């Protein structure tokens, strides 16, 4: 069943609103500084968006341990995909991403 962009946007907004979202502006700034670019492709000269590693549609939330900065291209491409399978399809370096994610999570969660 096909949905219009408007219907999709409204449903997504309702899912986001219903999720427990506790990422603060301070935490978002810290995440952007720690990654220093798109967490997926590494681009640094682009505007970064909040991307949930576990998508909202699959029970994810906007929290310090579930959000990474992503460029618009990666964020749109990943959409509601599971991060590791999406990275494999895009031929991105999954191992480096996961190692970096663990390193950044441990440094930020302890702060």
List where the protein language model places each region.
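Acidic-enriched, low-complexity/disordered segments with a strong bias for Aspartate over Glutamate
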Residues: 20-22, 45, 51, 93
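Low-complexity, compositionally biased segments
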Residues: 17, 23-25, 54, 69, ...
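Small disulfide-bonded, cysteine-rich extracellular recognition modules and tandem repeats
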Residues: 11-12, 56, 89
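Short, charged surface segments at domain edges that flank catalytic/cofactor-binding sites
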Residues: 1-37, 98-103
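Conserved phosphate-binding loops in nucleotide/dinucleotide-binding enzymes
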Residues: 73
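Polybasic, low-complexity binding patches
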Residues: 60-65, 76-111
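Histidine-centered nuclease catalytic patch
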Residues: 37-69, 78-85
């Amino acid at each position: 069943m096909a949905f219009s962009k408007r219907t999709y946007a409204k449903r997504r907004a309702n899912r986001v609103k219903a999720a427990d979202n506790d990422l603060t502006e301070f935490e978002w700034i810290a995440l952007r500084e720690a990654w220093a670019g798109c967490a997926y492709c590494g681009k640094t000269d682009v505007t970064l968006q909040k991307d949930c590693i576990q998508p909202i549609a699959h029970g994810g939330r906007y929290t310090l341990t579930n959000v990474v900065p992503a460029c618009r291209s990666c964020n749109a491409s990943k959409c509601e995909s599971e991060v590791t399978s999406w990275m494999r399809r895009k031929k991105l370096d999954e191992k480096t991403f996961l190692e970096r994610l663990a390193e950044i999570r441990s440094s930020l969660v302890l702060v």
